[in-house]
């Protein structure tokens, strides 16, 4: 596990969304508070939710961003405005995708347990999140004395902490890999210090409940 690196997290996601009941959590994507969701969505054709829907048109999206949800609904997407930590959608799914959302939440454990309640037994939860030890962050700390942190982030996860939290919440880990979307500026570091300096990582977990 975590012995391979992909360029695009969608390489991991796509096999788990074909011909399945899929929920995409955080479908609007994060945004700076000063930027309107509707404007940003209109200029972001490659957003994860759209890529998922292109593979599985029956996908349901959920997000707490009311403006963004309204914008997606106006485009014809099946979306719901709800808090992923406390939502009760009244239905279950085969796959839940949580792409770059867990680091925005006040209570990651509450979210994982609630995700489990929305999965059928043996269902799949896919979580991707930025890597706190990304080589670019190391450079920024060295150069500027601090890392670059999104204004809406509340926590950091690494593969060890996230897999431990998933297990505590009743999941078993099925797969994990690193995400490095562009060529590294620190090729020597990467060779010597392994992929732990990659940009992000993805964990695929199975719900063990009924």
Question: What kind of feature is each model-predicted range?
Answer:
Residues 3-20, 43-48:
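Conserved alpha-helix/loop element of class I SAM-dependent methyltransferases that forms part
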Residues 4-7, 27, 31-35, 40, ...:
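S-adenosyl-L-methionine-dependent methyltransferase catalytic module, highlighting the catalytic core
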Residues 85-96:
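A short acidic, Gly/Pro-enriched loop at the edge of an enzyme's catalytic core
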Residues 75-86:
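Conserved SAM-binding strand-loop segment of SAM-dependent methyltransferases
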